[in-house]
Amino acid sequence: MALHMILVMLSLLPLLEAQNPEHVNITIGEPITNETLSWLSDKWFFIGAAVLNPDYRQEIQKMQMVFFNITPNLINDTMELREYHTIDDHCVYNSTHLGIQRENGTLSKYVGGVKIFADLIVLRKHGAFMLAFDLKDEKKRGLSLNAKRPDITPELREVFQKAVKHVGMDESEIIFVDWKKDKCGQQEKKQLELEKETKKDPEEGQA
């Protein structure tokens, strides 16, 4: 899945020196706390991304709508990601796990035996977060935006557009998805019911 690829095909990044921090308003390398993880524990909508890697860009162009649920594990420093993709008017469900590096403010995933990383950029004021990856690579760098609401404000859209320009890409590279094309409502409902039943079974066995 394209979102899955974005989340896992990542590189460790240095701190970003903002030329206009008051305008870009992003912080890279901020430690991830329990409060941050509690805030992330929610339903999120993939809004869009600016990606120069041609393979990833092609995958994103196929997506009509994506939303996902994050469930952090504070003990193991991992998070479960349950994704719902609308592609070609069909819903595709996927589940994966990411590692959490609290001090570095990064998320990680093992791919082919190699641990790769992404910087988490929290935009708490806007109810959103960004993931930055491969910023050092002029041909593969990318930035994605995720929010708690699919219909983002003009202010958040502007923040993302400025951030994209700041890391060396053009606004024309941004691909936005259309939340109105969502076909995963029923699949999400079925998945939630299945999870409830799974939780019930152990309790019934102990009764």
UniProtKB/Swiss-Prot annotation:
One cellular component (GO) term of this entry: extracellular space
Signal peptide: 1-18
SS bonds (residue pairs): 91-184
Tissue note: Expressed by the liver and secreted in plasma.
SUPFAM superfamilies: Lipocalins (SSF50814)
One record GO biological process: regulation of immune system process
Localization annotation: Secreted
Glycosylation site list: 25, 34, 76, 94, 104
Main location: secreted
Keywords for this protein: Acute phase, Disulfide bond, Glycoprotein, Pyrrolidone carboxylic acid, Secreted, Signal, Transport
InterPro entries: A1A_glycop, Calycin, Lipocln_cytosolic_FA-bd_dom
Residue list for modification Pyrrolidone carboxylic acid: 19
Function: Functions as a transport protein in the blood stream. Binds various ligands in the interior of its beta-barrel domain. Appears to function in modulating the activity of the immune system during the acute-phase reaction.
Additional record remark: Eight genes coding for different forms of alpha-1-AGP are present in mus carolis.
Family stated for the protein in its record: Belongs to the calycin superfamily. Lipocalin family.
Entry remark concerning the domains of this protein: Contains a beta-barrel that binds various ligands in its interior.
Protein name (record): Alpha-1-acid glycoprotein 1
